[in-house]
Amino acid sequence: ALVSKNCAEWFICDLAMMLGDYVSVPIFPTAGADTIEYCVTHSESKALIGGKLDDPAATQQVIDAMPELISIALPYDSAPQCQYQFNALIADAVPSEERPQHYDDKLMSLVYTSGTSGLPKGAMLTYGAFSWSVQQLINHIGIQANDRLFSYLPLAHITERVYIFGSSIMGGVPTAFPESLDTFIEDVKMHRPTLFISVPRLWTLFQQRIQDKLPQKKLNFLLKIPFVNSLIKKKLAEGLGLEQARVLGCGSAPVSPALLDWYHSVGLNITEAWGMTESFAYSTINYPFRADKIGT
């Protein structure tokens, strides 16, 4: 089981589990102790990796309550107290020469979702489903090695796992991570992603951030002036760190067409996508990313 906010070590651990022929169980870093313990117990996990966390108390509680569980701490001050340290294991380990065979129907990961009611449900996801979803994404979006990704949505969520982890690993795309929530916007500006996917809530917050600085009536007036129109659009994109983004995406929850229309009016075309955990996130997508095709 892996409980951590997004970081490079998350990727390394997931790859290590694949190469070691283990099944990964990603858990949201905001999960409470009861949820973590349930997922660990239900999945019959033999180890728990704790990493970058806003509050390690819940993870620490599970580790302390389950002494039979192997625990490994990633190299962050906010990680829980564990039996083993990630850096020490890397330094002392002898790389295995064995390479397990991963067939399409072989179980890769158990991803727990809230479901519609009751306890979390574990979706059994295979290597074949992962490979297919990522390859479709790479083909449809045209992901290239010179693209840049920014990973901040929880990697325990299937969307981020496919879009970010899959694209970076199978597409060879460099990926950056936010230092913290407080530095989020500055981190995006520094990295200038060419592909950026988000959720309706964050796109709404971005809109509010813009409107707080530039009221809608004033924005509407400025957008009607031909020369100023292009300048305003450029400045807004730069203010969000998205002026180099060639694909903007939205998924994971319903989004208002009015919000998408608003972004289109300021020169940012957001592509909708829909999928489920059970389908490894990739089911439908607006293609070829046309703002006049909202909802199709």
Q: What are these model-derived regions, one by one?
A:
Residues 1-33:
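Conserved AMP-binding/adenylate-forming
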Residues 14-20, 42, 166-170, 207, ...:
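Short hydrophobic alpha-helices that are characteristic scaffold elements of the AMP-binding
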Residues 108-134:
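Conserved AMP-binding A3 loop
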Residues 131-148, 155-235, 244, 269:
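Conserved AMP-binding/adenylation subdomain of ANL enzymes
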Residues 176-178, 244-250, 257-296:
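Conserved ATP-binding loop and adjacent catalytic segment of the adenylate-forming AMP-binding
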